[in-house]
């Protein structure tokens, strides 16, 4: 049945990847592009939005890491290009504001690239290493929702601290 709709496993991968990237991109851009909101509020909303996206798609980070590490260069480029475009949009929008806030002494010196890497690293880690973490910190499934909420808010706190002077 899948073969009928998609033709190849590669086409199925590409369709799923693009759909998920669009969802994540929309959520991130919606948060980061709200120019009427203060910078920190947009960063916090973007961080929470990204975390919520990952919580709704917990297998996606591991899947992408596996696919990228096992992929040929053509697949790598097809995965990398839309992600690169999304990051360039976010960086292009935020970097001038970050530079201005750093110049005014309102936030600690940082580039958008470093800020995004910090945010993504904090959010993605649990979803990549959850099977190693859960036995020590998450006793049963009902605790998982509370644990994820705590992790999300801790990630926000860490980024807030990182930007504080």
Q: What is the predicted function of each stretch?
A:
Residues 1-11, 15:
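Helix-turn-helix
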Residues 8, 34-38, 56-60, 74, ...:
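Alpha-helical structural elements of signaling/regulatory helical domains
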Residues 11-13, 33, 48-51, 78-85, ...:
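A ubiquitous short alpha-helical element
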Residues 15, 30-62, 90-91, 112-119, ...:
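Hydrophobic alpha-helical connector segments
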Residues 18-23:
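Short, basic, alpha-helical segments at the C-terminal edge of helix-turn-helix-like DNA-binding modules
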Residues 25-29, 41, 73-103, 114, ...:
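Amphipathic alpha-helical packing segments from all-alpha helical-bundle domains
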Residues 49-52, 56, 88-108, 122-165:
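C-terminal peripheral helix-coil segments that are non-catalytic and often amphipathic
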Residues 56-78, 130-138:
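Amphipathic alpha-helical segments used for helix-helix packing
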């Amino acid at each position: 049945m899948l073969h009928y709709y998609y033709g190849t496993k590669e086409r199925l991968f590409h369709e799923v990847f693009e759909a998920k990237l669009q969802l994540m991109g929309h959520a991130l851009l919606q948060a980061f592009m709200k120019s009427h909101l203060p910078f920190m509020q947009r960063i916090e909303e973007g961080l929470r939005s990204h975390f919520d996206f990952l919580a709704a798609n917990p297998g996606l980070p591991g899947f992408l890491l596996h696919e990228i590490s096992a992929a040929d260069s053509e697949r790598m480029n097809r995965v990398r290009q839309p992600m690169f475009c999304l990051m360039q949009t976010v960086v292009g929008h935020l970097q001038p504001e970050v530079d201005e806030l750093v110049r005014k002494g309102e936030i600690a010196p940082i580039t958008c690239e470093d800020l995004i890497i910090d945010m993504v690293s904090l959010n993605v880690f649990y979803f990549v290493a959850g099977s190693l973490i859960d036995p020590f910190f998450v006793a049963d499934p009902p605790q998982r929702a509370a644990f994820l909420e705590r992790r999300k808010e801790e990630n926000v706190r860490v980024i807030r601290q990182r930007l504080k002077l």
